[in-house]
A protein has these predicted regions:
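Conserved acidic segment of CheY-like receiver
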Residues: 2-14, 19-23, 51
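Alpha-helical interaction/dimerization surfaces of two-component signaling modules
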Residues: 21-26, 42, 94
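Acidic, metal-coordinating helix/loop segments flanking the phosphotransfer/catalytic sites
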Residues: 32-50
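Conserved phosphotransfer cores of two-component systems
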Residues: 44-46, 68-74, 97
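Conserved phosphotransfer microenvironments
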Residues: 52-74, 84, 88-90
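As written
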Residues: 61, 92-103
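Hydrophobic/aromatic residues positioned on beta-strands within the core alpha/beta folds
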Residues: 79-82
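C-terminal output helix
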Residues: 86-87, 107-123
Length: 128
C-alpha cells in the first residue's frame, strides 16, 4: 500500500524539513511547499490524505483553511505555528466551524517525539 501523502506549507525551510522528516518516520510521504500558490497548485493537482499548515506566513494560514473548506477537503488538517496558544485554538475552531477535520493544533517549537506520535496516530486513523 502506498504511503499517504502529507502536504505541508511552511516558509521556514529548516522547520519544513523537520516536519517532513517526522512525517516520513510516521509513515507519510511528505510534500513541502513554502508559498500559498505552490500549496494550492499541488493540492489541486494531487489532493493529499493530510495537510499541515503554518499560520504565520506571508499568506495567512487561516486563508488556506478557508481554501481547504471551499475544496470540501475531508482529510486531517494539522495547524503548526509559533503563535500564542489562543490564536492556535481560534484557528482550530474556525476550521471546525468550516467543516474541516482539524487535528492539533501544535505549538512551535515542536517536540519531535510528540509530533511523531501525533502523526502516527493520525496515519493509523487514515488506514482504518
Amino acid at each position: 500500500m502506498a504511503q499517504p501523502r502529507l502536504l505541508l506549507i511552511d516558509d521556514e525551510p529548516a522547520l519544513a524539513e523537520y516536519l517532513a522528516n517526522a512525517a516520513k518516520t510516521s509513515g507519510f510521504d511528505p510534500v513541502i511547499t513554502a508559498r500559498d500558490e505552490d500549496f494550492r497548485n499541488e493540492f489541486l493537482a494531487n489532493p493529499p490524505e493530510m495537510v499541515a499548515l503554518d499560520l504565520g506566513m506571508p499568506v495567512d494560514g487561516v486563508e488556506l483553511t478557508r481554501f481547504l473548506a471551499d475544496q470540501d477537503y475531508r482529510g486531517p488538517v494539522l495547524i503548526v505555528s509559533g503563535f500564542d496558544r489562543r490564536v492556535l485554538e481560534s484557528a482550530f475552531r474556525l476550521g471546525e466551524a468550516l467543516g474541516l477535520n482539524m487535528a492539533g493544533p501544535v505549538e512551535k517549537p515542536v517536540r519531535l517525539e510528540a509530533l511523531e506520535e501525533l502523526l502516527g496516530n493520525l496515519k493509523a486513523n487514515l488506514v482504518q
